[in-house]
């Protein structure tokens, strides 16, 4: 995909809902853009389906659109250090212009490094690893410290793990985020967690961590749920149970004394504007189907004192079909659309059509 210096920037006049560019129409329902495609110069087209599904899902968020829009004055002077940002700009420029966006250049510049890093992964988890890797790179390229007196030693401060004063920890993480994490990724996708570790032999220890993506290990969660509630063995997991397993107290070995009765409790200190949930299925013993809602509230899992407004709605879902290919279902302008390879269709029975395949990634967006 060639980047033309004489861009027609009219598409940047689109409003935040991107309502004035339409390429698909069915029963008077319109969709603002076409599927991302991959040309045949990619050796294995099947491998590109999870990449295109992730990119298509990200493109549906207004924060990504506004970020790309803000780059229009910078893109002509982007250096080699911003290679991925530049390729994303080129790709999303075509997408937001109402054209077919070809991901070939993006994949050729990115895919080999990704495959090398994750060469031993389970292929069914590719969207999760790819998104995590992409977030890392975009964050690194977009990161701009706000404070000119930023102290880089904060990044490696041992007090992030060892300091036991909860409020000092919080202040340290706040400073860390403000000074070194000001990017499109940290501003919209970072979840900050508080971990309370309780051990019979050691003092309680509180520390923070942050993650782009919440990972639910469905096989383990179903095993825990079934052992705790044997009468539910024939029932699907639901998202509430997954959050309970993720945040609840699971016995593990204490890092300090080796006590096997240690329990770890996790709470959201800050929840992201866009909550990305990876559904990991190993399919060893438990084959896990998951029930999830289009609207969700995580108030029960927030740290005490946080404002009671964390209501999310399902914006996008990436799934794997019976042919081993990925597709994305995206909620746009009040309707659900399925993007699969070069095809775009509207979903009529959303509750059935979204749940009939194995979801791999769920994208929940915070309600205004």
Predicted regions and their residues:
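UBL (ubiquitin/ubiquitin-like) substrate-recognition surfaces
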Residues: 2, 12, 21-368
């Amino acid at each position: 995909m060639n980047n033309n210096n004489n861009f027609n920037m009219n598409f940047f006049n689109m409003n935040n809902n991107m309502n004035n560019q339409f390429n698909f129409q069915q029963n008077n329902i319109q969709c603002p853009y076409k599927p991302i495609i991959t040309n045949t110069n990619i050796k294995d087209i099947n491998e590109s389906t999870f990449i295109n599904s992730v990119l298509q899902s990200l493109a549906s968020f207004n924060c990504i659109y506004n970020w790309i829009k803000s780059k229009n004055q910078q893109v002509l002077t982007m250096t080699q250090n911003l290679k991925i940002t530049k390729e994303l700009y080129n790709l999303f420029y075509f997408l937001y212009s109402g054209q077919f966006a070809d991901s070939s250049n993006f994949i050729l510049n990115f895919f080999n490094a990704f495959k090398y890093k994750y060469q031993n992964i389970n292929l069914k988890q590719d969207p999760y690893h790819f998104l995590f890797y992409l977030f890392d790179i975009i964050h690194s390229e977009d990161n701009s410290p706000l404070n000119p007196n930023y102290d880089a030693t904060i990044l490696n401060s041992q007090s992030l793990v060892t300091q036991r004063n909860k409020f000092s920890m919080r202040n340290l993480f706040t400073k860390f985020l403000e000074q070194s994490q000001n990017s499109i990724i940290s501003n919209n996708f970072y979840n900050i967690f508080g971990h309370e570790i309780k051990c019979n032999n050691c003092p309680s220890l509180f520390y923070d961590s942050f993650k782009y993506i919440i990972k639910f290990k469905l096989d383990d969660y179903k095993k825990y749920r079934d052992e705790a509630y044997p009468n539910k063995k024939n029932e699907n997991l639901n998202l509430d149970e997954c959050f309970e397993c993720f945040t609840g107290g699971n016995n593990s070995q204490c890092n300090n004394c080796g006590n096997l009765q240690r329990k770890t409790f996790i709470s959201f200190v800050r929840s992201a504007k866009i909550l990305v949930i990876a559904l990991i299925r190993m399919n060893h013993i438990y084959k896990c189907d998951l029930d999830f809602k289009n609207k969700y509230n995580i108030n029960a899992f927030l740290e005490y004192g946080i404002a009671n407004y964390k209501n999310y709605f399902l914006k996008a879902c990436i799934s794997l079909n019976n042919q081993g290919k990925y597709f994305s279902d995206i909620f746009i302008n009040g309707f659900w659309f399925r993007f699969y390879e070069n095809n775009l269709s509207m979903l009529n029975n959303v509750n059935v059509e979204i749940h009939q395949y194995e979801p791999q990634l769920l994208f929940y967006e915070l309600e205004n």
